[in-house]
């Protein structure tokens, strides 16, 4: 029987539906392990959504013979690469949890503006059928990261520092080649940045709570 995978899926769905920690002094407070579990699940969900959308956009609009060259142009440059954030798991393991949370927060906040235009670009997308909710999902993950920061710092919430330079808005004029290239580059950066945030959160969760699933 497939009771194992089904149980795991139901547990993951239940965790995604859980609220974040209560206000200070409220009861009951969510354990730190649950905060990390929720954040990792949300980051994984967003990263997969971004990856699926990138692939769908690529299949629909970018000729296969042009994909490699386009990916190596300035259109594929992500300005988040200019911040001193770890580029992979090994580098992330050299940073403190608080540093990784701050980098994760910066990455998430840099997309809060641009993703509000996704629903206009992908109105007929099967993968992004709920694109108007991506902003809500990002805000939810932002809230979870801030809850973790409150727990790991001094217990008092800090105002999240939004990157001074955020990504451009997605272009809704899908008949323009320039708009297609711009959106293709943005989707590539969105996927890369969410992968970074997911990696940071998984590294933190694994080194705090020893698990058999830490290999990734």
UniProtKB/Swiss-Prot annotation:
The protein's name in its UniProt record: Somatotropin
Disulfides per UniProt: 78-189, 206-214
Role, per record: Plays an important role in growth control. Its major role in stimulating body growth is to stimulate the liver and other tissues to secrete IGF1. It stimulates both the differentiation and proliferation of myoblasts. It also stimulates amino acid uptake and protein synthesis in muscle and other tissues.
Keywords, sorted A to Z: Disulfide bond, Hormone, Metal-binding, Phosphoprotein, Secreted, Signal, Zinc
Superkingdom of origin organism: Eukaryota
Main location class: secreted
GO cellular component: extracellular space
Chain sites annotated for binding Zn(2+): 45, 198
Lineage: Eukaryota, Metazoa, Chordata, Craniata, Vertebrata
Protein's UniProt keywords contain Chaperone: no
UniProt organism field: Delphinus delphis (Short-beaked common dolphin)
Similarity-based family: Belongs to the somatotropin/prolactin family.
């Amino acid at each position: 029987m497939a009771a194992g995978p089904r149980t795991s899926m139901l547990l993951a769905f239940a965790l995604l539906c859980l609220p974040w920690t209560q206000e200070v002094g409220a009861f009951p407070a969510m354990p730190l392990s649950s905060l990390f579990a929720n954040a990792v699940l949300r980051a994984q969900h967003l990263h997969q959504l971004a990856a699926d959308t990138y692939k769908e956009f690529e299949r629909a609009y970018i000729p296969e013979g042009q994909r490699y060259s386009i990916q190596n142009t300035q259109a594929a440059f992500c300005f988040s690469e200019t911040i001193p954030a770890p580029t992979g798991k090994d580098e992330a393991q050299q940073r403190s949890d608080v540093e990784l949370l701050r980098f994760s927060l910066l990455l998430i906040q840099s997309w809060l503006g641009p993703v509000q235009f996704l629903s206009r670009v992908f109105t007929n997308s099967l993968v992004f059928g709920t694109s108007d909710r991506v902003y809500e999902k990002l805000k939810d993950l932002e809230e979870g990261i801030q809850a973790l920061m409150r727990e790991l710092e001094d217990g008092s919430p800090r105002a999240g520092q939004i990157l001074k330079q955020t990504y451009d808005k997605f272009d809704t004029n899908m008949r323009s080649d320039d708009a297609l290239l711009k959106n293709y580059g943005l989707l590539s950066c969105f996927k890369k940045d969410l992968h970074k945030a997911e990696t940071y959160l998984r590294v933190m969760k694994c080194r705090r709570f020893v698990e058999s699933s830490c290999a990734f």
